[in-house]
């Protein structure tokens, strides 16, 4: 299986035989219902909401909670050793429009990603892929990354980061595009042509989505805890 276009060495010793045997036993005994609901693998690109130049390959493994809401685990690659770097929630336009206006800038659209050919389902025949992407094209997503693999972090360091997606031509780094196209044997240009008929949200892209065209940065600050909250703790970070 192809690996990520951004690779770093993770600290720690190789998994021991005893650990592997224990995992085999627990894997047989226990159920993993939430994970067994994953039905879809989407590959796309994310950039940090405060720095479009920092772009990463993002593999989404998604499950439907219902027809209007999907939840996705995001890995840096499709292989067994891929790192869990974030999560994304995908909602229909109907659900997005119910969100408070203060919340909407944290969400992004998928129309350009889909119609631009840069969001795809590895290994899935085009006819099947396009049937689902017709729906994805109309949705909104909220993405948070915990592991900044693009800067070479060996572990998830620092604050969670709000991520955004491509919204027009010329934003995707060519080296990253070339790497992914070669690795998965896809052509973004060909897919762009195949998806020209698709349409985005029925009411158009909401003006508050995509961070309203501005940058968003996650920050942390120290505040005092209310006296009634706890007797032992005097500080909290938000």
Curated annotation (Swiss-Prot):
A GO cellular component annotation in the UniProt record: lipid droplet
Top-level taxon in the UniProt lineage: Eukaryota
Main location: other
Tissue-specificity statement: Expressed in seeds, but not in leaves or roots. Highest expression in scutellum. Detected in embryo axis and endosperm.
Keyword Metal-binding belongs to the record: no
Entry keyword set: Lipid droplet, Lipoprotein
Pfam families documented for this protein: DUF1264
Localization: Lipid droplet
InterPro entries xrefs: OBAP-like
PANTHER family linked to this entry: OIL BODY-ASSOCIATED PROTEIN 1B, PTHR31360
Family as reported in the entry's similarity comment: Belongs to the OBAP family.
Protein name: Oil body-associated protein 1A
Species of the source: Zea mays (Maize)
